[in-house]
Structures are given as structure tokens and as C-alpha cells.
């Protein structure tokens, strides 16, 4: 597998709709001149933004978290330009960008150093060949203090790896349960 460059990312986004909306360069400031956490195309990846809808874990119902029988009441919905994650807690968000992953590509998501250096960890499982949708982002606040996530700014980086041959069975072929997700998507069993 080979990691793909900015040229390949731009070509696939602009000619094949792999990322929408797409930013061909790296954005560091708003049109008004305000600094933002960078997003857009980088040397060997694409920095994604998160939307304004968040789900924050709460212990109001004192439920046990079970991925096979998940209780949506374990979350509080938040909509806004920022999300404050309580100490040692967790939140979900989604990317503004919609992805269409080619059949011979696997995409890995890593957190941005700006957040990692503040104790905020981003976790996303790989975007498999022929998966498409908005990515549900998982944020963990590992600190003893509240942590802030900024909507419409960079939160994670996608790296694209191209195989030397297409996979035998893609995510679309097997009817993956998160295909076409749009917005924050909770666990499905």
C-alpha cells in the first residue's frame, strides 16, 4: 500500500467526488482574518472539520454502555460553534465532508496535534474501500478539565492508502451497516 499525495487527493476530490465539500489548499484563517485550526489538503492527507451537532456522554441514567444494546439516552445533544466535553468524558461529532472511498483505497484517520497536545484524542475506525458518508468522529477528553472542540475547524487528518490491487469484497459489497451515514451516527448492532 502506498500513501497518497496532495496531487492525488486533489485529483480524486475534484474529478471523482471523493471529498465534498473539498478545500484544495490548507486553510488557516477565515476570510475575516481570524485564525482557525487548519483544515483542507496537506502534503499527504486531508484535514477534516466537524459539524455543529455533538452528542456528549452523560451518566444521568446510570446506564451500562453496551455496544450490542446501546441506549441513546446515554447522550445529551448539543448544537453550536463549540462543544465543551466534561473532564474524562467523551463526545461524538461528524465531518462536514462527505467521503466516497475508492475500491482500492483504505483511509486512516488520525487526530491533529493541536488537540492531542491538549489531551483530546480523536478516534475513528478505518474508512474501508467503497464506504461513503460523513464520518462519525469520537473525541475523548483525557484531562481532568473541561475541553473545547471547535466546529467548522480542523479536528483530524485523513490519510489515503492505495493498494496494488482492488479488494475482493468491499464495504459496499457486504452492505456495511454504516454505509451512507449522514450526521452523528450511534452504534448499530
From Swiss-Prot:
Pfam families: DCD (PF22769). It catalyses: dCTP + H2O + H(+) = dUTP + NH4(+). CDD domains: trimeric_dUTPase. Its EC number is 3.5.4.13. GO terms for molecular function: dCTP deaminase activity; nucleotide binding. PANTHER family: DCTP DEAMINASE (PTHR42680:SF3). HAMAP family: dCTP_deaminase (MF_00146). This is dCTP deaminase. It comes from Halorhodospira halophila (strain DSM 244 / SL1) (Ectothiorhodospira halophila (strain DSM 244 / SL1)). The lineage of its organism: Bacteria, Pseudomonadati, Pseudomonadota, Gammaproteobacteria, Chromatiales.
Amino acid at each position: 500500500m502506498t500513501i497518497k499525495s496532495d496531487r492525488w487527493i486533489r485529483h480524486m476530490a475534484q474529478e471523482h467526488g471523493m471529498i465534498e465539500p473539498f478545500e484544495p489548499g490548507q486553510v488557516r484563517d477565515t476570510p475575516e482574518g481570524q485564525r482557525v485550526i487548519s483544515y483542507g489538503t496537506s502534503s499527504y492527507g486531508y484535514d477534516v472539520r466537524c459539524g455543529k451537532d455533538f452528542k456528549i456522554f452523560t451518566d444521568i441514567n446510570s446506564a451500562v454502555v453496551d455496544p450490542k444494546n446501546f441506549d441513546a439516552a446515554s447522550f445529551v445533544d448539543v448544537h453550536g460553534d463549540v462543544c465543551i466535553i466534561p473532564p474524562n468524558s467523551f463526545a461524538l461529532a461528524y465531518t462536514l465532508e462527505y467521503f466516497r472511498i475508492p475500491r482500492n483505497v483504505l483511509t486512516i484517520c488520525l487526530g491533529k496535534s493541536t488537540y492531542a497536545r491538549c489531551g483530546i484524542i480523536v478516534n475513528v475506525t478505518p474508512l474501508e474501500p467503497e464506504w461513503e458518508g460523513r464520518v462519525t468522529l469520537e473525541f475523548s477528553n483525557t484531562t481532568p478539565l473541561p475541553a473545547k472542540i471547535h466546529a467548522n475547524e480542523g479536528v483530524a487528518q485523513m490519510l489515503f492508502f492505495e493498494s496494488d490491487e482492488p479488494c475482493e469484497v468491499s464495504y459496499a459489497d457486504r452492505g456495511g451497516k454504516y454505509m451512507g451515514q449522514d450526521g452523528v451516527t450511534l452504534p448499530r448492532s
